[in-house]
Amino acid sequence: MSAFDHSSDDTQETIGNSLRRRPLARKKLSEMVEEELEQMIRRGEFGEGGQLPSERELMAFFNVGRPSVREALAALKRKGLVQINNGERARVSRPSADTIISELSGLAKDFLSAPGGIAHFEQLRLFFESSLVRYAAENATDEQISLLSKALEINGQSLDDNAQFIRSDVDFHRVLAEIPGNPIFMATHVALLDWLIAARPKVSEQELHHHNNVSFQEHIAIFNAIRDRDPDEADRALQTHLKSVSATWRALGKSKKSAK
């Protein structure tokens, strides 16, 4: 029997009861404005780089108040469909890989805070970067290897400055992520590291000094394998490094909890 078959009173009663139990939510005015503007942008009524009408014009066009227009524009900005600068009308833009990944940020933080969440993200990073170093060993240009060498040099110069070491550590891995030339890889990698670093416990400079030295030596091993065009060794060095990093932060987190 079709869900739209009206021949059964029982079916009608069941559907009626179901609808009474789950009333449809009404859309906010801002959501309706957002949807209409999004459709207009996607249809090309407002071209990329062009400006949308002013807030006052949008208020008159949709017959809504300023808060509804501003909420709609803010939602479109989150989707990467418009850029908003103070004092200027919203300008149509094209969603980037960064926009796509940033939309996942809230969900990612929820996953990270769940039991086993950090371990799952660490595994994701391991799988992801394993492919990156293999690709780098097989395909990196001499110029890209030179950039990686420079990042490694800065990393080694930062051993005694923890904040600088973290930045140079991230930069070393960022250069790896740039080698394939895929913007989605870059956006994913940046977000993944941001999420994992934010989830790490706060520890003293002294505790991290030994860890920094170990990480730097592991970076050297990764670089050498890529320079030597050895994807298997690059993968082994990367796996050793990331597993070491994960184990170190787990140990630091446990010691901090036990000290409380």
Swiss-Prot record:
Record Pfam families: FCD, GntR
InterPro entries: GntR_C, TF_FadR/GntR_C, Tscrpt_reg_HTH_GntR, Tscrpt_reg_NanR, WH-like_DNA-bd_sf, WH_DNA-bd_sf
Coiled coil: none
A single GO BP: negative regulation of DNA-templated transcription
UniProt keyword annotations, A-Z: DNA-binding, Repressor, Transcription, Transcription regulation
Region (Disordered): 1-21
SUPFAM superfamilies (alphabetical): GntR ligand-binding domain-like, Winged helix' DNA-binding domain
TM ranges: none
Domain called HTH gntR-type: residue spans: 27-95
DNA-binding region coordinates: 55-74
Keyword Transcription belongs to the record: yes
Record GO terms (molecular function): DNA binding; DNA-binding transcription factor activity
NCBIfam families, A to Z: PRK03837.1
HAMAP family cross-referenced by the UniProt entry: HTH_NanR
Free-text function comment from the UniProt entry: Transcriptional repressor that controls expression of the genes required for the catabolism of sialic acids.
PANTHER family membership: HTH-TYPE TRANSCRIPTIONAL REPRESSOR NANR (PTHR43537:SF53), TRANSCRIPTIONAL REGULATOR, GNTR FAMILY (PTHR43537)
Family from the record: Belongs to the NanR family.
Protein's recorded name: HTH-type transcriptional repressor NanR
Organism for this UniProt entry: Klebsiella aerogenes (strain ATCC 13048 / DSM 30053 / CCUG 1429 / JCM 1235 / KCTC 2190 / NBRC 13534 / NCIMB 10102 / NCTC 10006 / CDC 819-56) (Enterobacter aerogenes)
Gene that encodes it: nanR
